[in-house]
């Protein structure tokens, strides 16, 4: 398929994915907050478990949580499910557009694992499917009722999946695939557990029967799981913009840490919504972020040290830098790319003009020296010595004369 069409598909499907994701996560946050804010009605009413008054958009809203009789089933009953389904469907399409087209250029990194295209796609889809099957088995079985034990097992399995993806895929792809796994668990919870429980609830009401209490309990459990996964998934959605995370040597450990921090912050708000203000959680989460920033600080030696650079303390000539860029970068980052996959310069970054190279010097260092995120999968074979030269050139002022 023409790269121009791929680029437009990427844009449109990504836009849909973001829109539906906002709708889904927004609904999740709202209903978790709503359940915690319900209070007994001022004027007690039969079957009304709680109510909430709100003001928004210039009007007053009264919400009631109630059990109803068959005759009271409304003609129109809104189900919150298509937000989840649409997010997952668009996400899977986006995964295919980005990682399965172009012979898997974003998926396969030969320096990590020498995979064929078919093997890479099989690992991708197989792991996503297997993750849901194992997770659902744990929580649908008696094991899911063992208190904190299944929680710890689930965390360990997730951490194992994170490590697993980093053994096979490029770091960008590994991060996004973890997000795909978590998104699949979330939509699986909606599709296979929450909506079926709600369907049985409606059917019981229509039949004049008392709904099984276990249905609501299990659905609420899966909904809570989704609630804790939202912040980590949102981070993963934006992570590809930050190579200081996915391109770090300990990228898998960074992702695990951020997932734990995100779930912890979500826990703070869940407790707060129930009236328990454990304010200490936020400073601890912030301290963890600052610790992560400190621990993952890049090693400065790459731009100062290697024995392979023969210039010593001499000035790095721009002619040498220009040669490196022409050999390693311009095949993609040009007004007329010659790469077999990219027909348009990624992110519109072009190195044809020397003044533009000077303006982009800091970005060049971040991507190719500090994080070693570029060239993508080191497709053009940039050497350690060449990265050192680029880093020193930027440190010297990025002169183009």
Regions picked out by a protein language model, each given a short descriptive name:
Residues 28-71:
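Membrane-interface amphipathic/juxtamembrane segments adjacent to transmembrane helices
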Residues 15-44, 181-197:
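Hydrophobic alpha-helical membrane-embedded segments
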Residues 1-11, 101-115, 166-178, 241-246, ...:
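Membrane-interface interhelical loops and short amphipathic "cap" helices
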Residues 144-152, 250-251, 272-286:
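Membrane-interfacial entry segments at the cytosolic side of transmembrane helices
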Residues 72, 92, 99, 275-282, ...:
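Aromatic- and Gly/Pro-enriched helix-to-coil junctions and flexible linker segments
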Residues 1-24, 143-186:
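Long, highly hydrophobic alpha-helical transmembrane signal-anchor segments
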Residues 62-80, 212-216:
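Cytosolic juxtamembrane amphipathic/interface segments immediately preceding
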Residues 79, 84-103, 163-176, 229-248:
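Alpha-helical transmembrane segments and their membrane-interface junctions
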């Amino acid at each position: 398929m023409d790269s121009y069409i791929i680029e437009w598909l990427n844009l449109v499907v990504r836009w849909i994915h973001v829109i539906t994701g906002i709708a889904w996560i927004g609904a999740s946050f709202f209903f978790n907050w709503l359940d915690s804010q319900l209070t007994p009605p001022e004027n007690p009413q039969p079957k009304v478990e709680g109510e909430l008054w709100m003001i928004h958009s210039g009007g007053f809203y009264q919400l009631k949580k109630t059990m109803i009789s068959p005759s009271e089933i409304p003609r129109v009953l809104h189900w919150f499910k298509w937000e989840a389904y649409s997010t997952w469907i668009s996400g899977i399409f986006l995964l295919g557009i980005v990682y399965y087209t172009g012979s898997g250029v974003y998926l396969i990194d030969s320096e990590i694992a020498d995979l064929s295209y078919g093997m890479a796609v099989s690992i991708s889809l197989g792991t996503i499917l297997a993750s849901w099957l194992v997770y659902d088995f744990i929580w649908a079985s008696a094991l899911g009722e063992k208190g904190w034990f299944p929680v710890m097992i689930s965390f360990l399995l997730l951490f194992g999946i994170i490590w697993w993806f980093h053994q096979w895929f490029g770091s960008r792809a590994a991060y996004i695939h973890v997000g795909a796994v978590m998104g699949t668990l979330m939509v699986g919870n909606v599709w296979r557990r929450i909506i079926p429980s709600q369907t049985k609830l409606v059917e019981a009401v229509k039949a004049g029967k008392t709904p099984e209490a276990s249905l609501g309990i299990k659905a609420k459990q899966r909904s809570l799981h989704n609630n804790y996964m939202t912040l980590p998934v949102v981070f993963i959605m934006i992570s590809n913009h930050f190579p200081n995370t996915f391109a770090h040597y300990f990228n898998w450990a960074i992702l695990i840490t951020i997932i734990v921090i995100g779930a912890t912050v979500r826990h703070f708000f869940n407790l707060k919504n129930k009236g328990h203000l454990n304010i200490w959680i936020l400073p601890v989460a912030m301290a963890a972020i600052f610790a992560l920033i400190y621990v993952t600080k890049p090693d400065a030696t790459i731009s100062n040290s290697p024995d392979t650079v023969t210039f010593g303390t001499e000035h790095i000539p721009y002619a040498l830098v220009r040669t490196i860029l022409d050999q390693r970068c311009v095949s993609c980052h040009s007004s007329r790319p010659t790469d077999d996959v990219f027909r348009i310069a990624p992110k519109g970054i072009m190195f044809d003009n020397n003044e533009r190279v000077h303006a982009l010097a800091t970005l060049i260092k971040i991507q190719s020296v500090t994080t070693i995120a570029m060239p993508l999968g080191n497709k053009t074979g940039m050497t350690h010595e060449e990265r050192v030269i680029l880093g020193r050139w930027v440190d010297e002022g990025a002169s183009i004369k």
